[in-house]
Amino acid sequence: MKINDLKPAPGSKKKAKRIGRGLGSGHGRYATKGLKGQKSRSGGAKGAGFEGGQMPLQRRVPKRGFSNAPFKKEYAIVNLEDLNKIIDEVDIITPETLLQKGIVKDLKDGLKILGNGEIKKSITVKTNAISKSALQKIQSVGGKVEVI
């Protein structure tokens, strides 16, 4: 036996039904769709969720609650350990300085400082939001926080 003698098992390969390719094919003319009617037309399938004219489930069930997603504030997040990288270069840390120094790529809806890590020296920080732990750590080394 050679590789060119190998054939698939009988009945394992089914030939594709090529419809609408002439009368000699056996599937020409009406292309297995029957005669007239909605199902024989192009785009003739009923929509997903169509229940024969009965009010669909999606419209029978009442709406509940609300979504506040469009008004959600998404802050650019910076930890205290990240502030240590530029603490020697600047006295006042603002969202704009962090953007210039490349610590923040996009300010989004503002800047929020979180308390991961320790701060080396006292600084003044201007930010849109700050966590309690970050506030305590900055104030413990004699720094000031201004919420803008």
UniProtKB/Swiss-Prot annotation:
InterPro entries noted in UniProt: Ribosomal_uL15, Ribosomal_uL15/eL18, Ribosomal_uL15/eL18_sf, Ribosomal_uL15_bac-type, Ribosomal_uL15_CS
UniProt GO BP: translation
SUPFAM superfamilies the record matches: Ribosomal proteins L15p and L18e
A family per Pfam: Ribosomal_L27A
Gene3D superfamilies attached to this UniProt entry: 3.100.10.10
Region (Disordered) residue spans: 1-61
Gene Ontology CC annotation, any one: cytosolic large ribosomal subunit
GO molecular function annotation: rRNA binding; structural constituent of ribosome
Keyword vocabulary terms for this entry: Ribonucleoprotein, Ribosomal protein, RNA-binding, rRNA-binding
HAMAP family: Ribosomal_uL15
UniProt family annotation: Belongs to the universal ribosomal protein uL15 family.
Function: Binds to the 23S rRNA.
Assembly information from the UniProt record: Part of the 50S ribosomal subunit.
Protein name, entry field: Large ribosomal subunit protein uL15
Organism whose genome encodes this protein: Thermodesulfovibrio yellowstonii (strain ATCC 51303 / DSM 11347 / YP87)
